[in-house]
Amino acid sequence: MAVSRFEKSALAAGGLLACAALIALATPATQFRGADAQPLTYFIAEGSPPSGFQPSDRELAVWALQAWARATPGSLDLQAAREEDAVVRVYWSPPDDNTFGEMRPLTTHGRQGAAVFIRADMNALGLEIGLRARRDPLWRESIVYLTCLHELGHALGLSHTADMRDIMYYFGYGGDIVDYFARYRQPLHTRDDIAGASGLSTADVQRVRALHPPR
């Protein structure tokens, strides 16, 4: 995906402006639509230390997939697979990448799917978010999880919304970015709480069910 001059400048400037520009990238929705009676195969890559990746981030990505699957029972039969066989693939953006999250459509054995790229480096999101992530591991993990959830939503065919209650909200519409993440983080007590706190709004659930009806 091309990155605009403004987005590159915002990243260089740091702070919440950079965060907003990076999160607001208009990732197009993939053409993957509806249940096709085949498992939804997925692959979660390892990341490099310079990318900000931590080994436990792979579990956050799995939890995000499971949250979408729970939202539409029986429709998304998740199955781990080799990279070359996976319909949905999750990667961790390198440190020199100018995007925060991105989804790229791909085709696997004739099935339409997506490669998802996640930035795990909190320092790239500005001083306030970076410092808070160092003090509070759950803050960092909340952001990584929500980013996975958002980009995997694109992989499942969902586009952006203008409602800040939605995980598919587009930050280009404005709003308090720190508060957006804090609203999810605040009720969490342990990391395991993330697995049961989907982060999906009623509208998110309705939209994914329209594309992938429960069975």
Q: Where are the language model's segments positioned?
A:
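Divalent metal-coordination and catalytic microenvironments
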Residues: Y42, W68, H150-G153, M168, ...
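Metzincin-family zinc-dependent endopeptidase catalytic domain
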Residues: D57-D163, Y173-D176
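Residue-level detector of alpha-helix boundaries and kinks
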Residues: G52-F53, P137, D192-D193
